[in-house]
């Protein structure tokens, strides 16, 4: 059993001056090519990897999921495909800082915008040549107090597992391959008849084993709980989000892979004078991963190499 702990902490303190008025550019007045994501759709998806839930949520955004298993690296983002021999990945900016999007929860997010054209490079430099996924987290609103709690538990059924030959068909085709190579068949007629009438896993002489069925479950489980607090007045506004997420893998035999993660975020805005304001954003994440019997997709790779008549 291998445990891996991650502790992620970021903090930011910024002071800005305002000259009594602000300008809010509407989407239809902007010259940038922007797609916006519906945050409520992301919250409804039973996937603990936030990056995976962005697939199909914005025009022109391509999401390539990581196939390593629960708790692995973020999905890869491409805007308008891969168009050069170099890196084509879009970058993720969260509240002005480049960070992995899976570091946060959907409940922390106010908006997600995908910048697709040259305006992204103007704003964020050469690293944004391939597009920017711009994430803004929630902030408190004066006179509007919010207390929200949510809890989820569910199962994620396997879409499809590979189907392999049973022992009888495997032995029959193996004999044909031997004959085609000018060799004698490996399995006798008695063996073939034994495999045809095999009682399955417990047949000592002629086993017929579906290793995917024996080693893997038909579904994994996930669990999630979040608490949101926000509010404030004309002088100070706050927004706090605390969340727990967890997931268990498909392993039926041996140690089961497991992920437990706690996220916490606090955003504070203070109006010091009519011309001076300060904001502080703090985010933390503590994560425990148990890789189980095999790391990532290693179990799938090994099961696929086992013959159905190899072990009783």
Set out the residue ranges of the language-model regions:
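Short linear motifs in intrinsically disordered
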Residues: 78-85, 303-304, 309-311
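Outer-membrane beta-barrel and related beta-rich outer-membrane complex signature
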Residues: 158-167, 252-254, 279-281, 286-310
């Amino acid at each position: 059993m291998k445990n891996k702990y991650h502790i992620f902490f970021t903090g930011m303190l910024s002071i800005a001056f305002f000259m009594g008025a602000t300008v809010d550019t509407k989407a239809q007045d902007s010259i940038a090519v922007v797609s916006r994501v519906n945050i409520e759709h992301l919250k409804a998806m039973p996937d603990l990897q936030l990056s995976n839930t962005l697939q199909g949520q914005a025009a022109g955004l391509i999401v390539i999921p990581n196939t390593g298993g629960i708790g692995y690296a973020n999905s890869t983002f491409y805007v308008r495909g891969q168009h050069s021999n170099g890196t084509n990945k879009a970058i993720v900016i969260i509240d002005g800082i480049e960070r992995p999007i899976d570091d946060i929860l959907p409940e922390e997010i106010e908006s997600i915008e995908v910048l697709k054209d040259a305006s992204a490079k103007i704003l964020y430099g050469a690293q944004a040549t391939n597009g920017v996924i711009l994430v803004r987290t929630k902030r408190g609103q004066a006179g509007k107090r919010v207390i929200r709690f949510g809890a989820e538990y569910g199962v994620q059924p396997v879409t499809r597992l590979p189907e392999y030959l049973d022992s009888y068909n495997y032995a029959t085709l193996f004999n044909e391959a031997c004959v085609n190579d000018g060799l004698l068949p490996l399995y006798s007629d008695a063996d073939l008849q034994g495999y045809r009438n095999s009682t399955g896993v417990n047949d000592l002489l002629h086993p017929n084993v579906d290793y995917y069925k024996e080693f893997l479950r038909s579904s994994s489980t996930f669990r999630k709980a979040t608490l949101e607090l926000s509010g404030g007045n004309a002088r100070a506004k706050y927004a706090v989000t605390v969340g727990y997420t967890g997931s268990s893998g498909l392993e039926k035999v041996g140690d089961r892979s497991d992920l437990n993660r706690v996220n916490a975020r606090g955003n504070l805005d203070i109006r010091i004078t009519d011309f001076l304001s300060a904001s502080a954003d703090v985010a933390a994440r503590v994560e425990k991963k148990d890789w189980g019997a095999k790391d990532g997709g290693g179990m799938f790779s090994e099961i696929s190499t086992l013959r159905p008549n190899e072990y009783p």
